[in-house]
């Protein structure tokens, strides 16, 4: 089989082609339908979280174990040599990678995963670096979109909330730009999509519109991607002002498309009310579950040649 992802670092979604994204999605679907509990037997995966995480870490470690691999690492760097003794990231990566077959990491500094890949002896998978990239979240988002829409092409997609600091929306916008989707960006001016993303869309000839409210947007959509205003990136006064700017309620779904699905990278705060959970449009909990299959697919492709083009 031809597998272009074998032994490859996964640092940014922009490092992946349309064909590679489609391969990951199809592999996730295959593993969801047909589990492979021994695929990573005797493989050791380092799971190193220099920044706190719940869903990403647990999802990734579940993915490893359900493929038969084992996990080493830490959920918080505060008690490691890097946190306690001032060891450099480069030194930590060189040592930890020597114990493992792949290195999965999250870090609060932009570019940390790229730096780690320069010193690692095994493939590095980025679990999020600051407000920059979160490629494995994007892969589970793509899988969830494909699962609900039957395609990734020519969809109407809205991103709502914190579009400035939300690394999930940056990565997913870049990925979907390869599939001729039309974008609707809904955010307060202080949290609008970064100019570099806007410039990339213009260069690719993608269609997009920017809004400061949800009014008139919902009826157009196939996918509504909600995000929280991230408290850790604001002082308390700014956060209280921003957090409730855009709230989705069940009453707002009148006149929407039957195939509309609401996604959210979680955790949610105020931006989706709980009455949305019981509507046919809510898909964020299934989306979170899909993180296991998307990360299984990535591990399967990076560490084995069992999948790919025949």
Curated annotation (Swiss-Prot):
GO cellular component: cytosol
Family matches, as SUPFAM superfamilies: Aspartate/ornithine carbamoyltransferase (SSF53671)
Keyword terms, alphabetized: Pyrimidine biosynthesis, Transferase
Biochemical pathway: Pyrimidine metabolism; UMP biosynthesis via de novo pathway; (S)-dihydroorotate from bicarbonate: step 2/3
Binding site residues for carbamoyl phosphate: 55-56, 106, 134, 137, 266-267
Binding site residues for L-aspartate: 85, 167, 228
GO MF term (any one): amino acid binding
Catalysed transformations (reactions): carbamoyl phosphate + L-aspartate = N-carbamoyl-L-aspartate + phosphate + H(+)
Single biological process term from Gene Ontology: 'de novo' pyrimidine nucleobase biosynthetic process
One Pfam family here: OTCace
Tagged with keyword Transferase: yes
InterPro entries reported for this sequence: Asp/Orn_carbamoyltranf_P-bd, Asp/Orn_carbamoylTrfase, Asp/Orn_carbamoylTrfase_sf, Asp_carbamoyltransf, Asp_carbamoyltransf_Asp/Orn-bd
EC number(s) from the headed UniProt entry: 2.1.3.2
Superkingdom to which the source organism belongs: Bacteria
PANTHER family in alphabetical order: ASPARTATE CARBAMOYLTRANSFERASE (PTHR45753:SF6), ORNITHINE CARBAMOYLTRANSFERASE, MITOCHONDRIAL (PTHR45753)
Quaternary structure, from the entry: Heterododecamer (2C3:3R2) of six catalytic PyrB chains organized as two trimers (C3), and six regulatory PyrI chains organized as three dimers (R2).
Function: Catalyzes the condensation of carbamoyl phosphate and aspartate to form carbamoyl aspartate and inorganic phosphate, the committed step in the de novo pyrimidine nucleotide biosynthesis pathway.
Family, as annotated: Belongs to the aspartate/ornithine carbamoyltransferase superfamily. ATCase family.
HAMAP family assigned to the protein according to its UniProt record, in alphabetical order: Asp_carb_tr
Identification of the protein by name: Aspartate carbamoyltransferase catalytic subunit 1
Gene designation: pyrB1
